[in-house]
Amino acid sequence: MRLSQMLFVTLREDPAEAEIPSHKLLLRAGYIRRIGSGIYAYLPLMWRVLQKVSQIVREEMNAAGAQECLLPQLQPAELWRESGRWETYTKAEGIMFSLIDRRDTELGLGPTHEEVITTIAKEMIRSYRQLPVNLYQIQSKFRDEIRPRFGLMRGREFIMKDAYSFHASEDSLKETYQAMDQAYRNMITRCGLEFRAVQADSGAIGGSASQEFMILAEAGEDEVLYTEDGKYAANVEKAVSLPPDAELSPFTTPEKRETPNTNTIEKLCQFLQCSATAIVKNVLYQAVYDNGKTVLVLVSIRGDQDVNDVKLTNELVRLAPQYQATTLLALQVPDETAQAKWAAKPLPLGYIAPNLEDNYISSIPDITPKFLRLVDKTAVELKNFITGANESGYHQVGANWGQEFVLPSLVVDVRKAMAGDRAVHDPIQTLQTARGIEVGHIFQLGVKYSQAMGATFTNEQGEEKPLIMGCYGVGVSRLAQAAVEQSYDKDGIIWPVAIAPYHAVVVIPNINDAQQVEVAEKLYTELNKVGVETLLDDRDERAGVKFKDAELIGIPYRIVTGRSLQSGKVELVERSTKNSQEIAIDQVVETLKKLINV
């Protein structure tokens, strides 16, 4: 391709809307263009990158025995109601775009395709002889993100590969799950990226086990906790660990003490000269279920620990049937405005005890009249602890479960693991932290969808059983931007060869120099002929502008037909190292073929 014929515009300044390096560079280098909030156009250079990523993904999926198909983006609401996810995905903080057609039929724009594929399997799969089967597609998805940001990282329209497998047994599912794990490792490795596979929370997709594939990058939205021995890695949402040992409480006798202006853990520790590990703090949450019922949740946890909202959400979803609900729509720490809607009297915030009385809750329809009390394992172990006294300016010291306070019946693990915690598999090791960008996620779904939607098969014994499912997603457009986030410098993008839009760019410093043009044209033709995908910068621009643009767009190799032509050579510059060498014109093609491994 000739740059003079390409829709190609670069920017010298960072766009104001861009927050992270990869977003800035893709906009500046003319790869993408913002059309609206979270909506981007993929311009010619970017489309080539996306096609290459898609092809690598396609090849690895095919090699693993999956079959490509294409599913509808418009999905009937009744399918999602059948699975029980319509309310979750369209109400409160739901991410599905929903619409009503001219026949007053509700539809959703697909954020994912479990319901559609399960319906197809329900209608087409009858016998164990048809199993296992693994279907995948590469298409645009739509999600109504609350806060679209970071360009293609968190957009409202994006390209994704999603796959769904069906099985007659758990063993068969695990076999495919492992095959997908290896396929994903192959995909990301072939794209030339550093990554870490980590244990993950299954979220709204559900299932018994899941794993994320994280591209390591400082601007990553996710925190990964891992051990140096490589035996443990998990998203912080899922991570488990051993917290530091608690220090002994300085109080051995139960007593209510005046503690003025100590409504934070830090202030309380200073006032009482105690460790935060000797404190039980009580955190109030407001949970809204899909049947409209609001439950006030009181979580007791050790004072130096924080509640992991994802773990807490999972616990509350598990408890949903107790409230005649199926899932959770929203979870928040209620602010003054939210409290005013249900609090019968002012709450002693900062001084709440585990036994906060239920009469703080007004008698209102759809507000559960009693607190749901949960206690984290870290708080259960404490003796002679310090906690609130349900009165502003006062705390209880020297308290114990079973004496001053009744231990809640629901003992849970909802603490947030942190860097520096001890590893469960080897307490000598401590957890390290890294930032990551999630580009892939694989799930063992089990029978969650097939059971809800009546997708069954007949097994070898002639029994009707629900299909066992797995699902596997790769963010194609996100992976492409993650590559930039992992590999750039002050001058621009540094694409890995495998997914670069072009392998090489031939730059003509002076288009009025006939020899420069002639040699450039010859190299451009010969390189493309042997499979070295080459761009020709034949624009009527200053040489400096061309060199700057070449570095900005990140093509792996730059060939310059400049002054060295007088000695029968051209300059070859490697983008990643900026190493420059002069090579004979007749050696350029073979040299490039070896460098990019054609």
From Swiss-Prot:
Q: Which Pfam families match?
A: HGTP_anticodon (PF03129), tRNA-synt_2b (PF00587), tRNA_edit (PF04073)
Under the heading InterPro entries, the entry gives: aa-tRNA-synt_IIb (IPR002314), aa-tRNA-synth_II (IPR006195), aa-tRNA-synth_II/BPL/LPL (IPR045864), Anticodon-bd (IPR004154), Anticodon-bd_dom_sf (IPR036621), Pro-tRNA-ligase_IIa (IPR002316), Pro-tRNA-synth_IIa_bac-type (IPR004500), Pro-tRNA-Synthase_IIa_type1 (IPR023717)
Single GO molecular function: ATP binding
For this record, an example GO cellular component is: cytosol
What is its subcellular localisation?
Answer: Cytoplasm
**Catalytic activity, as annotated:** tRNA(Pro) + L-proline + ATP = L-prolyl-tRNA(Pro) + AMP + diphosphate
Entry-linked SUPFAM superfamilies = Class II aaRS ABD-related (SSF52954), Class II aaRS and biotin synthetases (SSF55681), YbaK/ProRS associated domain (SSF55826)
UniProt entry keywords in alphabetical sequence: Aminoacyl-tRNA synthetase, ATP-binding, Cytoplasm, Ligase, Nucleotide-binding, Protein biosynthesis
Q: What is its EC number?
A: 6.1.1.15
| Any single GO BP term | prolyl-tRNA aminoacylation
HAMAP family assigned: Pro_tRNA_synth_type1
Q: Which family does it belong to?
A: Belongs to the class-II aminoacyl-tRNA synthetase family. ProS type 1 subfamily.
Q: What is known of its domains?
A: Consists of three domains: the N-terminal catalytic domain, the editing domain and the C-terminal anticodon-binding domain.
Oligomeric form and interacting partners? Homodimer.
Q: What does the UniProt function comment say about this protein?
A: Catalyzes the attachment of proline to tRNA(Pro) in a two-step reaction: proline is first activated by ATP to form Pro-AMP and then transferred to the acceptor end of tRNA(Pro). As ProRS can inadvertently accommodate and process non-cognate amino acids such as alanine and cysteine, to avoid such errors it has two additional distinct editing activities against alanine. One activity is designated as 'pretransfer' editing and involves the tRNA(Pro)-independent hydrolysis of activated Ala-AMP.
Which protein are we looking at? Proline--tRNA ligase
